[in-house]
C-alpha cells in the first residue's frame, strides 16, 4: 500500500527519495492484495532486467517542457503513430508530432462547442475520436491530422472506445448512451450515422470502456461500479478468453463492495492485467483472465497524513508544502469537471505509472516497490491524467544500430525518448517528463514553459501590474523589532525587486506584526512570516505565489543572510528566514534578498531558545513590528 506524504517545517532543505519494499507476487492465479507483511523465510525475488526496463522510462525529477491550451486540459493520449494528442475544456483538440527529442505542434481543431468528455485512440494509432454533450462523435485521421468523419447521435454519449485490432477490415467504434443501458457499435468509414450493432450490456449506463486487443474483449464499468467483459465481435461474454464462468468466483465486485465507482480503466500491453482508478483514491490491478485482484494501492489522504508523520523520507514534504497540497486535494474532491486520473502500464507490463498528491509514481508490480517518483518537487502542479510514450508502441519497427555505434563504450542513452505526457488540475498546459532535467537558459523567455498561446487578458494585466510596481523606488533597509530586541537588515531591491517589494509592503502594512518565529533550528536558521504560526500559511501582496529571483552576487555564503522560504521553485509567499551559519546548499533554491547588519546577537538569542521535536520554540518569540524608512 503506497501513499503520499507531508512534512513539517516549511521549505528549507529537501530530502532524497527512498524505496519502500514490499512482497512479490507469485503467479497470476494466486491473487495478492498488497502490500502485506513479508513472508518469513522467503527472499524477495527481483525482477529480471529491471534496470533495462527502468532505462526505458522517464526519470527526471522535474518536467522538461510544457505547452499551452486556451483552457484547462482534461485529456491526454499517445498514439502509436508517434503523435501526442491533448484536449481541453473549451472543446479544442491539439495534435503534437513526436520528434527525436521533444515534440512539435502539428494541428489544432475546434472539435466541440462544449468540453471534450471523451478521447480515444485506436490500437494502431491511426484513428482518434472525441465526444462531448453536443450529440456528436468526431473522428480524426491521426497521421494526416485531418477530421475524416462525424457521427451525429440521437443521444448524449457517455463513453467511447475503438474496438478493432490491426488488420481488421472494419475500424469499429463503441459508443455508450449516457442515459440508457445501450452500447452502440459504429463503422465510421461507412458514412452512416446508424450503428451496425446495439446491445444492453449493463444494468446501468456505461461510464467507462477499455478494449483489450490481445483477447478482442471490452472491459466496461457502469455508473454503479459493476465491471463486465464482452466480446467486441459478438457482444457476448467471452467464455474462451477467461478462466471463470461466474463473477462470484472473481474480485470484479470489488468496486461496488467498496461503495465507489470507476474513474478510468487501462489495459496492460500484454493483455494480462488491467488497472482501475476510483474516487476512493485506491488503484486496483486485476488479472484479466481470472478477474482476481493482484494489487491494491491506497493513495488516500489519511494514508498520506500517516506517512507524513512517519520517518519515510520518500513520502515526506516540508510542512508548508504539505499543507498547500492538502488544500488542493480537498478542492479537487469538490471539482466534478477535473480530469479523471488513470494508471497506465509500461511496455513490459511490469511497471504501473499514475499521478498522486506527491507526484507521478512508478511502481514495480513484480516486487511491489516504488521504483521512482517524478515531479515531487513540482509543488504548483497536481498531475491527474497520464499517457506514456516509449518509442514504437506497435513493435513493428526494428531500430538498427550501425556497427560503429554498437560499441560498449558509446553513449548509454536509449534510442527512444521515453516521455510521460500529463495534464494537471486547473492548468492550461500539458506537461512532459523525460529522462532529461529542464535546461536553464540565460533568457527566461526561453524556459521550459512554452507560451504557444496568447495569455488571457487578466493574466496580461496582472503581469503588467507587477512590472509597474517593481519600477518604483524601494527601501534598502528595515528594522525588525522583536520581543528579544531589534534586528537591522539591509535589502537588495535592484537584484530582487519583487521580493523586496513584497517584503517591505507587508512590513508597512503591519502584516508581520505579532508573527511568531515558528521554526528555530540551532546551527541553521530562524524562520517567521506565517500568520498561522505553524508554517502552512501566508501569501504575497499579490495574493498568489511569485517567482524566485536568484542573483549570482547574493548567495547563502555567510551567516545572518535574509532569504525567502518556499515550497519549491517559484512558490514564494510571505515566509522568510535568517540563517545563523553559511548554508550554500540553499543557493538557487531560495531567494536571498537581504543581510543582517546589526542585531546579530538578537538573532543568536532567538536561535538558542529551547524548541520541541518540531523545532517550535516553547517560549513565544514574536515580531512586534517592522520600521520601514520612507523611500
Swiss-Prot record:
Expression induction or repression: Down-regulated by auxin treatment.
Tissue: Ubiquitous. Expressed in the meristems.
Source organism (scientific name): Arabidopsis thaliana
Family the UniProt entry places it in: Belongs to the cyclophilin-type PPIase family.
Keyword match Chaperone: yes
Name listed for the protein in its UniProt record: Peptidyl-prolyl cis-trans isomerase CYP71
Known catalytic reactions: [protein]-peptidylproline (omega=180) = [protein]-peptidylproline (omega=0)
SUPFAM superfamilies (UniProt xref): Cyclophilin-like (SSF50891), WD40 repeat-like (SSF50978)
Function: PPIases accelerate the folding of proteins. It catalyzes the cis-trans isomerization of proline imidic peptide bonds in oligopeptides. Histone proline isomerase that increases the rate of cis-trans isomerization of the synthetic histone H3 peptides H3P30 (RKSAP30F-p-nitroanilide) and H3P30K27me3 (RKme3-SAP30F-p-nitroanilide) in the histone H3 N-terminal tail, in vitro. Histone remodeling factor involved in chromatin-based gene silencing. Reinforces H3K27 methylation.
Superkingdom classification of source: Eukaryota
Disruption phenotype: Bushy and stunted stature.
Amino acid at each position: 500500500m503506497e501513499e503520499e506524504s507531508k512534512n513539517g517545517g516549511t521549505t528549507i532543505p529537501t530530502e532524497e527519495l527512498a524505496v519502500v519494499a514490499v512482497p512479490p507476487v507469485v503467479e497470476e492465479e494466486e491473487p495478492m492484495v498488497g502490500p502485506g507483511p513479508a513472508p518469513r523465510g522467503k527472499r524477495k525475488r527481483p525482477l529480471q532486467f529491471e534496470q533495462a526496463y527502468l532505462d526505458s522510462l522517464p526519470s527526471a525529477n522535474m518536467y522538461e517542457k510544457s505547452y499551452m491550451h486556451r483552457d484547462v486540459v482534461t485529456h491526454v493520449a499517445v498514439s502509436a503513430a508517434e503523435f501526442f494528442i491533448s484536449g481541453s475544456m473549451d472543446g479544442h483538440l491539439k495534435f503534437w508530432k513526436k520528434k527525436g527529442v521533444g515534440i512539435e505542434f502539428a494541428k489544432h481543431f475546434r472539435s466541440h462547442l462544449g468540453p471534450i468528455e471523451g478521447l480515444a485512440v485506436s490500437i494502431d494509432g491511426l484513428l482518434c475520436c472525441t465526444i462531448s454533450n453536443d450529440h456528436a462523435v468526431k473522428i480524426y485521421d491521426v497521421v494526416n491530422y485531418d477530421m475524416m468523419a462525424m457521427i451525429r447521435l440521437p443521444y448524449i454519449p457517455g463513453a467511447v472506445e475503438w474496438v478493432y485490432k490491426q488488420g481488421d477490415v472494419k475500424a469499429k467504434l463503441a459508443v455508450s448512451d449516457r442515459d440508457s443501458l445501450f452500447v452502440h457499435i459504429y463503422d465510421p468509414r461507412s458514412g452512416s450515422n446508424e450503428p451496425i450493432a446495439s446491445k444492453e450490456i449493463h444494468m446501468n449506463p456505461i461510464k467507462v470502456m477499455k478494449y483489450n486487443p490481445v483477447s478482442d474483449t471490452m472491459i466496461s464499468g457502469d455508473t454503479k461500479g459493476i465491471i463486465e467483459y464482452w466480446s467486441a465481435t459478438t457482444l457476448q461474454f467471452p467464455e474462451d478468453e477467461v478462466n471463470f464462468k461466474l463473477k462470484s468466483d472473481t474480485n470484479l465486485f470489488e468496486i461496488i463492495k467498496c461503495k465507489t465507482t470507476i474513474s478510468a480503466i487501462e489495459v496492460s500491453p500484454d493483455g494480462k492485467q488491467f488497472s482501475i482508478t476510483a474516487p476512493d483514491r485506491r488503484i486496483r490491478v486485476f488479472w484479466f483472465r481470472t478477474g482476481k485482484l493482484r494489487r491494491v494501492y491506497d493513495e488516500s489522504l489519511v494514508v498520506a497524513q500517516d506517512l507524513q508523520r512517519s520517518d519515510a523520507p520518500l513520502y515526506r514534504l516540508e510542512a508548508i508544502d504539505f499543507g498547500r497540497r492538502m488544500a488542493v486535494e480537498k478542492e479537487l474532491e469538490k471539482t466534478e469537471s477535473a480530469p479523471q486520473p488513470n494508471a497506465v502500464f509500461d511496455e513490459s507490463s511490469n511497471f504501473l505509472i499514475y499521478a498522486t498528491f506527491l507526484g507521478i509514481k512508478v511502481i514495480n508490480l513484480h516486487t511491489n516497490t516504488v521504483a521512482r517518483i517524478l515531479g515531487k518537487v513540482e509543488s504548483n502542479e497536481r498531475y491527474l491524467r497520464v499517457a506514456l510514450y516509449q518509442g514504437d508502441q506497435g513493435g513493428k519497427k526494428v531500430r538498427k544500430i550501425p556497427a560503429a555505434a554498437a560499441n560498449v563504450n558509446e553513449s548509454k542513452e536509449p534510442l527512444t525518448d521515453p516521455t510521460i505526457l500529463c495534464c494537471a488540475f486547473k492548468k492550461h498546459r500539458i506537461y512532459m517528463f523525460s529522462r532529461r532535467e529542464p535546461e536553464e537558459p540565460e533568457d527566461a523567455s526561453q524556459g521550459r514553459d512554452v507560451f504557444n498561446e496568447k495569455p488571457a487578458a487578466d493574466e496580461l494585466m496582472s503581469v503588467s501590474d507587477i512590472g509597474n510596481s517593481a519600477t518604483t523606488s524601494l527601501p534598502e533597509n528595515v528594522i525588525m523589532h522583536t520581543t528579544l530586541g531589534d534586528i537591522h537588515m539591509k535589502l537588495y531591491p535592484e537584484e530582487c525587486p519583487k521580493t523586496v517589494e513584497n517584503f517591505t509592503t507587508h512590513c508597512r502594512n503591519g502584516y508581520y506584526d505579532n508573527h511568531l518565529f515558528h521554526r528555530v533550528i540551532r546551527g541553521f536558521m530562524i524562520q517567521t512570516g506565517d500568520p498561522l504560526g505553524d508554517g502552512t500559511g501566508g501569501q504575497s501582496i499579490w495574493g498568489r505565489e511569485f517567482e524566485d529571483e536568484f542573483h549570482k552576487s547574493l548567495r547563502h555564503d555567510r551567516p545572518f543572510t535574509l532569504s525567502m522560504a518556499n515550497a519549491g521553485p517559484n512558490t514564494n509567499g510571505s515566509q522568510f528566514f535568517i540563517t545563523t551559519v553559511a548554508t550554500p546548499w540553499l543557493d538557487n533554491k531560495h531567494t536571498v534578498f537581504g543581510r543582517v547588519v546589526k542585531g546579530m546577537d538578537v538573532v543568536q538569542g532567538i536561535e538558542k531558545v529551547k524548541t520541541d521535536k518540531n523545532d517550535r520554540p516553547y517560549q513565544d518569540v514574536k515580531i512586534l513590528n517592522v520600521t520601514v524608512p520612507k523611500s
